[in-house]
Structures are given as C-alpha cells and as structure tokens.
Design a protein with these regions (language model features):
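Acidic/proline-rich low-complexity IDRs
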Residues: 6, 42-44, 121, 134, ...
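Beta-propeller and closely related beta-pinwheel folds
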Residues: 52-66, 96-110, 141-321
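Generic detector of low-complexity/intrinsically disordered segments
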Residues: 45-47, 81, 89, 132, ...
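Anionic group-transfer/hydrolysis microenvironments
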Residues: 128, 174-175, 350
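Beta-sheet repeat architectures centered on beta-propellers
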Residues: 1-99, 104-120, 262-277, 283-531
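Short beta-strand segments and strand-loop junctions that repeat across beta-rich extracellular domains
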Residues: 86-93, 131-137, 180-202, 242, ...
Length: 531
C-alpha cells in the first residue's frame, strides 16, 4: 500500500471465512451493484428496498403461503393467502381492505403449504390433503373442498407440493413412511367439479402417475419452469417435459434423458425459481451445504462460497432453510433464510455476489433473519408476509424504513453495514492518517416543520459510524459518528482522522437511517513503516 491519498478496495459482497485475517467482509442490507460505462466506479453499495404495510387487516395467525392467481372474479387476478387453517382472497389491497374468507378449513398442520392454480381452481397441498377453491367464485361463495385422490399401491396419497404445467396440476406423494418417488398428474383444465388425478373410467380409481426414472429418491420438490418439470429428491433431480400426447390424458409427459444429476436438496423449502433459474440448498450422497443454480437443461452450478458453506454447516437446522427468489431493478435475487440462526443470505445473479439481509428487534436490539416471506407481484406492488401479526407488507424503494421484528410495524430505520476487505502491505505496519467515505450526501428527506408555518429548512442529520480493526477483524475500536449531510448539503465530506494502525487493517461502516442512499467507495491517506 503506497503512501498518499488513494482509493482502496471497499465495495463487495459478504465473504467471511474462519480465518478473519484473510477476509472479514460482510455486506448487510446493501446490494453490490454494477454501474454503467464511464461511471466513477465499477461497483457501488446500493440500498436494499424499504418496507411498508400494504394492508392494515390482521389475521392474527402466521402466514403459510401467498399466491397471485392467474384469474379471479371478472377475469381479474387476485391475491390469495393461507393463514393458520383459513384461506383468504384479496381482489384489491389497501389500508382498510378486509379480504374475503373461504368457508371450510385446512385441517392439517401449521407449516408451509404449496399453492398453484390452473386458471379454474386454486389448489393447496398441505402434506396431507389437496384442497381446491373456485378462482372465480364471488366473495360470499368461496368454499374449500378436498380432492378425492386415488391410492398408489394401496396407500393414500399425501401431497406436499403442487405445480401447474401444460393445463394440468401435478402433485407429489409425501406419505410418511412410504417415501415414494412418484408424481401424479390431473386431467386437463379441471374445475372444482371435474378435477381428477385418476385414469378415467377405472374402478376403484387408478392413479395417473409417473415414477422418477433416474433415482429411487422420494420426490420432495416439484418446480414448473419454462415448460419443464424439475423433480427434486434428497439426493438427485431429474427433468420432465410435456410430450407429444400432452393434450390427451394417456401419456402427457416425457422424461428428459441426460438432464439429471446426483445433486438433490437437503431443504425442500429452499427450492425457488426465477426466470430460467432454479435454486436450492443441495444435498447428495457425497456432501451437503452447497447452494446450486440450475439454468434450463444445463448441469447445476455451485454458487455458494466456501465461507458460506462453512456457516451453513454450523447450523443445526439447515434442513429447515427457506428459499425464495424475486427480481428488482435489474437484479435477480435468491434469498435463503435460516430462521433459527437469525441468518438470511442473498445471491445476486447479475454480480454473482452474496450479501446479507437482516431485520432488527428494536426492543432487544438484536438483528435476526430478514422477515419477508412468500413474495408476489400483485396490484402493481411487490407484496410479502413478514409481520408478527399477519399483515401483508410491500418492498419499496420509496422509503428506508423496515419492519420492527418486535412490533410488526414498518416504522424503524434500516440498519446497514459494510465490513471491507483486509488492507495490508506485505505485513508492514500501516498507519491510517485520514479516511473518507465516497458516498451520496445531502439527500435526507425534508421533515415537517417543528412549528406550524415555519419555513426554515428542516431535515434530519444522518450519521455514519466507523469501526476499525488493525488485526484483521479480531478486535475493534469505535470511532465517533460523522454526519453525511442534511438535505441539500451535497458537498458534505464524510471523513475521520488518525484512525489507527495495523498490519491487517479493516474498516466497518454502519448506518441506521430511514431513507435510501448509496456508497461508492473509500479513500485513505496512509503511511507505511518497516516490519
């Protein structure tokens, strides 16, 4: 590291192996984002979206799934949600909107359920029963009913996953103890009155099903993506596709030979998709804890890092990991949450970098896993469930506020953090005389005047907190807060002097503000001395 003022590496993703002196990097509630041609830097830290409450109605029960249907009353798509044992439908959403409730109850379990629709019925698989409701029924006529499923080999079918492809619904069989590697398919365009998974005319009803061809793995996940069915077990996956007879009831699907691998999933709820990408937390006879991305018919690509896999291995509940994917401003994100460990890690397809997201309990001051679950795009909003009282919220770039994990209210500032890479110079002693943050300043929103009629500019005074480590991140020294500019103060500089010394120098910046801002880099003035 030469002397004088220089730009040093700072922006990046999370990568923190056990040996901290190698790298202690963490990026929390920031997204490393590529810039355009001739920009001042190639990569910046952009803010993750804020959160706001989209509907004040409270279910009082945990959400088990959300789904944006293909149609509804008057041909308009709707939002559906399963909360506890009840199913609700929103034809619009807003502050004081109350959803319509289906008659009947989902009587099995309290965990996640799987939802799909075929344009006629909404289908819900809860691990025991397949439930359906008419998509187009009026609010007062919404009624749940159970589908009579045929037995397979003399035992009842217990579906935990449902998907839709080629005008058919497809389900697995998660009957405990059976461990069956079969999936059943329905008739074409089944309604609440006609939906069937049995061969027409058979008595007793004989199931329409296929057995997995590549492995005897029980089927734990089914993903319909780009006209293909991805069938995933604990130690393998394979791909099926609609065949020449997909418009008849005889033999609608073909196994895609060669599109298989001995990589399955150790966490069925981690399976997620976006565009042509399918993700999951992988498991096989050879090992566990790697995250894979599969695109089309290609072989799966490991996208997790060694540091992340070590972190996953430390979890005692990795099999309960939850995954979902969503797109935002040119990014495609795969989010993987380990609730018991208070951890959410996010892979960005555009940069191939990982970052972290967290939500804070402002009563205890503890940061935990990111709250959002079950994201859907509906009503022109990116909706999700993530409150403690069952309210629907949305992700938005209009605010930097986030949901308080203690109260469920979206009224707290986002807590953002970046721990940069280790700065070192062949083990020489490095003394940092001055440190400046290259960041967006002066964009603090205007506040309401403290005195009515007062026209004096009034805005909050946002601050950045600096911590430094001279030993690679093992011990830290807190330095004072610095302002990064009231509203309109675009020339504000954010810098510290006499920041300390070390042979492995690490910088950590923290922010707790309720508006979005961007960080571009770090400049330091440093001196070197001999070993």
């Amino acid at each position: 590291m030469a002397g004088g003022v220089q730009m040093v590496p700072f922006v990046g993703g999370s990568y923190a192996p056990a040996a901290r002196f190698v790298s202690a990097q963490r990026t929390v509630n920031f997204v490393p984002e590529k810039t355009g041609p001739d920009a001042r830097t190639d990569l910046v830290l952009a803010p993750t979206p804020g959160e706001s409450i989209a509907c004040s109605w409270k279910s009082g029960e945990p959400c088990r799934a959300l789904h944006w249907s293909s149609t509804g009353p008057n041909g308009q798509p709707c939002l559906w949600g399963v909360f506890g044992s009840s199913v609700y439908r929103w034809t619009t959403i807003g502050e004081n909107v109350t959803p319509a409730k289906c008659t009947g109850s989902i009587v099995s379990g309290t965990g996640r359920v799987s939802i799909a629709d075929n344009g006629y019925v909404l289908a819900i698989a809860d691990g025991s029963t397949l439930w359906v409701v008419d998509l187009s029924a009026a609010d007062g006529a919404l009624a749940l009913s159970a589908v009579a499923l045929p037995e397979v080999s003399g035992a009842p079918v217990r579906p935990s996953v449902v998907a839709y492809i080629a005008s058919r619904l497809v389900i697995n069989d998660a009957n405990p103890g059976e461990g069956r590697n079969v999936f059943l398919f329905s008739n074409l365009n089944g309604t609440t009155a006609t939906l069937s998974f049995a061969i027409p005319g058979t008595t007793p009803p004989a199931p329409q099903y296929y057995s997995a061809q590549y492995s005897a793995d029980p089927i734990e996940g089914i993903v319909a993506n780009n006209g293909r069915l991805y069938i995933v077990g604990p130690n393998s996956y394979e791909i099926w596709a609609p065949g020449a007879n997909s418009d008849t009831g005889d033999d609608p699907f073909d196994w895609v030979s060669g599109a298989t691998s001995e990589i399955g999933t150790q966490a069925p709820a981690s399976i997620a998709q976006i565009d042509e990408c399918v993700f999951w937390l992988g498991g096989s006879a050879a090992g566990r804890n790697a995250v894979y991305m599969l695109q089309g018919l290609r072989q799966p690509v490991r996208v997790s890092t060694n540091a992340l896999e070590r972190r996953i291995a430390e979890s005692s509940t990795s099999s309960a990991a939850i995954g979902f994917a969503y797109a935002d401003e040119g990014h495609k994100f795969y989010c993987l949450t380990f609730d018991a460990d208070g951890l959410t890690v996010v892979f960005d397809v555009s940069t191939q970098l990982w970052h972290e997201r967290s939500s804070r309990n402002w009563t205890t001051g503890e940061d935990g896993a990111w709250l959002p679950r079950f994201p859907v795009n509906g009503f022109g909003q990116r909706l999700f469930w993530g409150t403690t009282d069952g309210r629907i919220a949305e992700l938005t770039h209009e605010t930097g506020r986030m949901i308080d994990a203690a109260t469920g209210n979206a009224d707290k500032p986002a807590v953002r953090r970046r721990v940069g890479p280790v700065l070192w110079s062949a083990l020489k002693r490095v003394t940092v005389r001055d440190l400046a943050v290259d960041m967006e300043t002066g964009t603090t929103p205007e506040l309401e005047p403290e005195t009515p009629g007062d026209l004096t500019p009034n805005s909050q005074n946002p601050r950045a907190m600096l911590r430094v480590s001279g030993d690679g991140g093992y011990t830290w020294a807190d330095l004072s807060w610095r302002s990064f500019g009231r509203q309109g103060n675009y020339g504000q500089t954010v810098h510290w002097q006499n920041c300390g010394w070390g042979r492995s120098f690490v910088v950590e910046l923290s922010f707790s503000e309720d508006f979005p801002f961007t960080v571009a880099g770090l400049r330091i003035a440093a001196e070197e001395s001999a070993l």
